[in-house]
Amino acid sequence: MMTYIVFILSVIFVVSFVGFSSKPSPIYGGLVLIVSGGVGCGIIMNFGGSFLGLMVFLIYLGGMLVVFGYTTAMATEQYPEVWVSNTTVMGVFLLGLLMEVMLVLYVLKSEEVGVVFKFSGVGAWAIYDTGDSGAFSEEIMGAAALYSYGAWVVIVTGWSLLVGVLVILEVTRGD
């Protein structure tokens, strides 16, 4: 049952990114990023990385929601465009969904997929095993995982927030 839940969460995760890439209005872009952040952290928490999922979600909401709040405030429209109002946007959205379905069928057909990384152990990178010592709780080990195995997540998140703020400042400054 949990495999199906993770599969459904993964599909929602990718569909939300396809929805973000074909967003017609900044309001919907921020909405689907919040949904994708919550679903992604749910996937991490399903594999046992509760603290890492919580930290990523808090960093995500703390940083990116502020950036998209400013974006929405600067580019607000009285009648925002939706996905079905433009045939090009709807076509890009449907093409992205078709590509996702083809990728899912390819992954389900083969046992091990090695596109960029090898995906044999799905959640192994999100779990920091404590071993046989029962003196440590999962939350303490989650903090250790955030700064050891999850250091690249913190670096990428910080860099993404910096780039996002600089892009928003450049767009809103205008000429």
UniProtKB/Swiss-Prot annotation:
Keywords: Electron transport, Membrane, Mitochondrion, Mitochondrion inner membrane, NAD, Respiratory chain, Translocase, Transmembrane, Transmembrane helix, Transport, Ubiquinone. It is an enzyme of class 7 (translocase). The chain crosses the membrane at residues 1-21, 25-45, 47-67, 88-108, 149-169. It is a multi-pass membrane protein. It comes from the Eukaryota. It catalyses: a ubiquinone + NADH + 5 H(+)(in) = a ubiquinol + NAD(+) + 4 H(+)(out). One of its GO terms (biological process) is mitochondrial respiratory chain complex I assembly. One of its GO terms (molecular function) is NADH dehydrogenase (ubiquinone) activity. It is found in: Mitochondrion inner membrane. Its EC number is 7.1.1.2. GO terms for cellular component: mitochondrial inner membrane; mitochondrion; respiratory chain complex I. Core subunit of respiratory chain NADH dehydrogenase (Complex I) which is composed of 45 different subunits. Belongs to the complex I subunit 6 family. Core subunit of the mitochondrial membrane respiratory chain NADH dehydrogenase (Complex I) which catalyzes electron transfer from NADH through the respiratory chain, using ubiquinone as an electron acceptor. Essential for the catalytic activity and assembly of complex I. This is NADH-ubiquinone oxidoreductase chain 6.
